[in-house]
Amino acid sequence: MAEAAATGAGGEMMAAVAAGEGCSGPAGLSLGRGFSGYRPFEPQALGLSPSWRLTGFSGMKGUGCKVPQETLLKLLAGLTRPEVRPPVGRGLVGGLEEAAQEAGLPVRAEPSPTFPTLGIGLDSCVIPLRHGGLSLVQTTDFFYPLVEDPYMMGRIACANVLSDLYAMGITECDNMLMLLSVSQNMIEEEREKITPLMIKGFRDAAEEGGTAVTGGQTVINPWIIIGGVATVVCQPNEFIMPDSAVVGDVLVLTKPLGTQVAVNAHQWLDNPERWNKIKMVVSREEVELAYQEAMFNMATLNRTAAGLMHTFNAHAATDITGFGILGHSQNLAKQQRNEVSFVIHNLPIIAKMAAISKASGRFGLLQGTSAETSGGLLICLPREQAARFCSEIKSSKYGEGHQAWIVGIVEKGNRTARIIDKPRVIEVLPRGTAATALAPENSSASSEPSL
């Protein structure tokens, strides 16, 4: 470890952080809930050319299409109305009495209740409703194809939309809408064969999440786009505000990093110029396995982790997507009520993706800036609860494929986040593979980690 452990995290848990320890299910052939029996997509089985590629109908991939975070906040500044409702916090909800009076409803004599509120720039919006002490929690997301299998692309898109609710510990979604753009560059045969598969994948993932797709919007566009809106009405005790991290908490991550690297490397198999830059550090078979692992991880719902956030008293969380683990950590740190900062020591990464990132000179994976799509939850947990969370999430009662690693600590600070100079890379082996005989320097294989 290149830097000394911060004070206040506790000796026992810091030992786990320093060792790069975590929890994951044993390597095996199970594909996880919803993926058993999966067969790789073959275009020719649908009567399409073997060279047909879903990713050929867009110029960007997945959550890599996001506007840079600083630019985004500037663009959205005009939407913020602090006089009505603070962007984050637990302030009084202004205007509720006036709205009730206008509607002819009785107004209580006592002061307005205090409701949790979230607004622009965060994972989900939390809007207090006028009746019954309930809140509307809503999120929307969409992106472009990043895998070739249209069914799995639909699942990934739905999982990504729901993940913003899961980041708040919400496990139930009342309704989903689907947003779909069909490429004008597709011939009619392609549209008729591919589009239903994307829709089915989205619908199946929604059903796995206990919700349903009841509408949406479908348009023609040069690029394929898929995403949606997730909505739930709930009581304040059903969600966890992302603002209560305390000194001594530890950071837990529930999916490995490297999805964007994996899907790009998979496309480079057919691009000699790109492939020549990485072929000395990875084999074609390793790229195929990493791509499949990335696809299954992206399509896995964060619902189990969301439920366990309540069980183990999580203080805050976010999901890791287009801004990378560092960008989302920084955004989460800014929302904290206490004067804390996040320090990341360990980076669980799909095996060989760190080497590809270095060899290609792209992505910024070890710097934490590489985009992820439908990534895991980064959760602030009490020190004494983190190990139990990691152990519980891999229980067979939740299905195969769930993982978690302790990746950092919460220390006293000024609401910032950083990755240490030489983070420990945890090589996460694709399911169905055996542990490597020798892990690279400054890394550890994770087939059977212990706490």
From Swiss-Prot:
<dbReference type="InterPro" id="IPR036676">
    <property type="entry name" value="PurM-like_C_sf"/>
</dbReference>
<feature type="site" description="Important for catalytic activity">
    <location>
        <position position="66"/>
    </location>
</feature>
<feature type="modified residue" description="Phosphoserine">
    <location>
        <position position="49"/>
    </location>
</feature>
<keyword id="KW-0832">Ubl conjugation</keyword>
<feature type="binding site">
    <location>
        <position position="123"/>
    </location>
    <ligand>
        <name>Mg(2+)</name>
    </ligand>
</feature>
<dbReference type="GO" id="GO:0004756">
    <property type="term" value="F:selenide, water dikinase activity"/>
</dbReference>
<comment type="similarity">
    <text>Belongs to the selenophosphate synthase 1 family. Class I subfamily.</text>
</comment>
<keyword id="KW-0712">Selenocysteine</keyword>
<dbReference type="GO" id="GO:0016260">
    <property type="term" value="P:selenocysteine biosynthetic process"/>
</dbReference>
<keyword id="KW-0460">Magnesium</keyword>
<dbReference type="InterPro" id="IPR010918">
    <property type="entry name" value="PurM-like_C_dom"/>
</dbReference>
<dbReference type="GO" id="GO:0005737">
    <property type="term" value="C:cytoplasm"/>
</dbReference>
<feature type="binding site">
    <location>
        <position position="164"/>
    </location>
    <ligand>
        <name>Mg(2+)</name>
    </ligand>
</feature>
<feature type="binding site">
    <location>
        <position position="319"/>
    </location>
    <ligand>
        <name>Mg(2+)</name>
    </ligand>
</feature>
<keyword id="KW-0597">Phosphoprotein</keyword>
<keyword id="KW-0808">Transferase</keyword>
<comment type="subunit">
    <text>Homodimer.</text>
</comment>
<dbReference type="GO" id="GO:0046872">
    <property type="term" value="F:metal ion binding"/>
</dbReference>
<feature type="active site">
    <location>
        <position position="63"/>
    </location>
</feature>
<protein>
    <recommendedName>
        <fullName>Selenide, water dikinase 2</fullName>
        <ecNumber>2.7.9.3</ecNumber>
    </recommendedName>
</protein>
<feature type="binding site">
    <location>
        <begin position="215"/>
        <end position="218"/>
    </location>
    <ligand>
        <name>ATP</name>
    </ligand>
</feature>
<keyword id="KW-0711">Selenium</keyword>
<dbReference type="InterPro" id="IPR004536">
    <property type="entry name" value="SPS/SelD"/>
</dbReference>
<feature type="binding site" description="in other chain">
    <location>
        <begin position="121"/>
        <end position="123"/>
    </location>
    <ligand>
        <name>ATP</name>
    </ligand>
</feature>
<keyword id="KW-0067">ATP-binding</keyword>
<dbReference type="InterPro" id="IPR036921">
    <property type="entry name" value="PurM-like_N_sf"/>
</dbReference>
<feature type="binding site" description="in other chain">
    <location>
        <position position="141"/>
    </location>
    <ligand>
        <name>ATP</name>
    </ligand>
</feature>
<dbReference type="InterPro" id="IPR016188">
    <property type="entry name" value="PurM-like_N"/>
</dbReference>
<keyword id="KW-0479">Metal-binding</keyword>
<feature type="binding site" description="in other chain">
    <location>
        <position position="164"/>
    </location>
    <ligand>
        <name>ATP</name>
    </ligand>
</feature>
<dbReference type="GO" id="GO:0005524">
    <property type="term" value="F:ATP binding"/>
</dbReference>
<keyword id="KW-0418">Kinase</keyword>
<feature type="binding site" description="in other chain">
    <location>
        <position position="66"/>
    </location>
    <ligand>
        <name>ATP</name>
    </ligand>
</feature>
<dbReference type="Pfam" id="PF00586">
    <property type="entry name" value="AIRS"/>
</dbReference>
<feature type="modified residue" description="N-acetylalanine">
    <location>
        <position position="2"/>
    </location>
</feature>
<comment type="function">
    <text>Synthesizes selenophosphate from selenide and ATP.</text>
</comment>
<keyword id="KW-0547">Nucleotide-binding</keyword>
<keyword id="KW-0007">Acetylation</keyword>
<dbReference type="Pfam" id="PF02769">
    <property type="entry name" value="AIRS_C"/>
</dbReference>
